[in-house]
Amino acid sequence: MVRAIVGANWGDEGKGKITDMFASQADMVIRFQGGANAGHTIINDYGKFALHLLPSGVCQPGTVNIIGNGVALDIEKLVKEIEHVTSAGVPQPNILVSERAQIMMPYHVMLDTYEEERLKDKKFGSTKSGIAPFYSDKYAKIGFQVCELFDEEYLREKLERVCEVKNLLLEHVYHKPTLDVDELFDHMMKLREMVRPYVADTGKIIRQAVKDGKNILLEGQLGSLKDPDFGIYPMVTSSSTLAGFGAVGAGIAPYEIKEIGTVTKAYSSAVGAGEFVSEIFGEEAEKMRNHGGDAGEYGATTGRPRRMGWFDCVATRYGCEAQGATQVALTALDCLSYLDEIKLCVGYEIDGEVTKDFPVTSRLKKAKPVYVTMPGFKCDIRGIREFDKLPKEAQDYVLFIEKEIGVPIKLVSNGPRREEIIVR
């Protein structure tokens, strides 16, 4: 059975913990899109890990961890992550890398950084991980697949063609030093040896696992509102964040995905620029940021403080619909225990009219939040394992969200560790 774990919002919803929990039951965990631009945090007996490329099943003995064809593969960062987890005592994980995955090139990161500098106050808030230039090259058909590392003659000829184009950009748009083909080729040869032990025809392996009835977990990155088609364009990422793309990024038929677990947080947070209707500011935001997560709300990749806001029912309902959610995991409920009252955004006022539909970006810019206020629960709820043992105010909060988003909330996370979860 194939299950996808994806985000309903801007990312940072707590998917890492939920994926880690399901990974303990999975034969195979697959990253199907994105790159090292966002991190999943998991906490277990080995320690705390912010994983950027490795699937969240790396700490599970016997689990096959696959980096699929849809991933932006930064080989150096992948190897560093493997070394990081094994140095913490995690047994050498079983990792496979798709031969069709495309490689993050050094100039992708450079161009990402230079473009943000050029845009100045109009920048996108990129993590400068090279994601947009990478996917631009992929769809312009000048990217490099892993399999091409093993054909030296073809690789050098292609590098010469691609560098000619990149050097025009570097010299005339960004006024930066140009690329040296020989240096880049030598670098690619080093990458080849680093990734060689992991390369496989993962699509074939995954399809066989589906036929054999294995438990397969598709691990998404970021969330619905960062999808390039259905997100808050242009403040989005460059690969689809939706469960539907999981089939493409792993190499299986779409009808094989039987469950879509969509993750949302009990409040809202976002990194980077873009519309955020329920955002809060100042001391109110700082308090929520410091109470959030397991060590405050700061980006796992950049360390930047996340923007904070109240739970947005409009955005989350839309995010769940875009994902095709069959069930929801609500995370970080315990982080709200300091509040006397909790607000939820239940509608948007746009040009004097209230709507519960999530609009396109041009209208979203005009939206003002419509709030309801609920009483807080003002007590430590960590350690509680049954829903009906939660304070009534906490139960009411969860049930209100469930009614608003229209998808059953099956999991409620009340702490950062894997075992701190309530199954309904």
Where are these regions (language model features)?
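Non-transmembrane, aqueous-exposed alpha-helical and coiled segments at domain scale
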Residues: 1-424
